[in-house]
């Protein structure tokens, strides 16, 4: 914690308060075996050698020529539908994306006093964590679910896989030819393509007050 008086004159005063915290942890021993689905969930899960709330991802390997996402599976093969979410033994293929808990966080505020008026501007900040983006992709959509903003950049025609990572909206033919197509979209939702930094600086409060002369 750091507090400073930047300016202190008869009718004007400016003060700053700064709070900083750093948190770090590591699981050194763990008996139970986690499943793939536990480790790729955005809430974070424990794995020996990593932070308590670690987030892992299925390695994304791009779209194929039909706009279907592909991944590296537990056997080292590139696949669209071969990810087994209940796997407990072969989990080393997963990518460590980061921790769900921020490692650096705190707040800072400035207070300005001028002829009885007082203005307070307060910010909070948080850095070092990752978030799993919403699981919005699936093999079939309704009018209510086909609304993610990412769809404007989706795969549409062959060759688009060179420029986008957003899967195709599957056709009825694709659904018929691959009854396991839903697995590809589910894996995409939990892949390295759907990870984002959770860093933020947020304006938390702005207040104005006045102290009447006594």
Across the structure, where does each feature detected by a protein language model lie?
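Conserved small-residue
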Residues: 5-100, 140, 151-168
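Outer-membrane beta-barrel architecture
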Residues: 1-3, 17, 59, 109-111, ...
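Transmembrane beta-strands of outer-membrane beta-barrel proteins
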Residues: 14-16, 108, 114, 119-121
């Amino acid at each position: 914690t750091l507090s400073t008086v930047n300016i202190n004159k008869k009718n004007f005063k400016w003060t700053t308060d700064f709070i900083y915290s750093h948190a770090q942890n590591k699981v050194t021993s763990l008996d139970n075996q986690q499943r793939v689905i536990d480790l790729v969930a955005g809430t974070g899960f424990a794995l020996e050698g990593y932070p308590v709330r670690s987030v892992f991802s299925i390695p994304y390997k791009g779209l194929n020529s039909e706009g279907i996402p592909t991944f590296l599976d537990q056997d080292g093969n590139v696949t669209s539908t071969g990810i087994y979410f209940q796997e407990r033994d072969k989990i080393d293929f997963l990518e460590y994306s980061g921790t769900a808990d921020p490692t650096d966080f705190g707040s800072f505020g400035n207070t300005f006093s001028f002829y009885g008026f007082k203005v307070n501007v307060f910010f909070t900040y948080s850095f070092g964590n990752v978030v799993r983006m919403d699981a919005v992709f699936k093999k079939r959509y309704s009018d209510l679910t086909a609304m993610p903003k990412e769809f404007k950049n989706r795969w549409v025609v062959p060759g688009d896989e060179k420029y986008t990572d957003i899967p195709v909206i599957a056709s009825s033919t694709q659904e018929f030819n691959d009854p396991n197509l839903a697995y590809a979209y589910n894996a995409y939702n939990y892949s390295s393509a759907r990870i984002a930094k959770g860093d933020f600086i947020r304006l938390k409060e702005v207040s104005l007050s006045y102290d009447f002369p006594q």
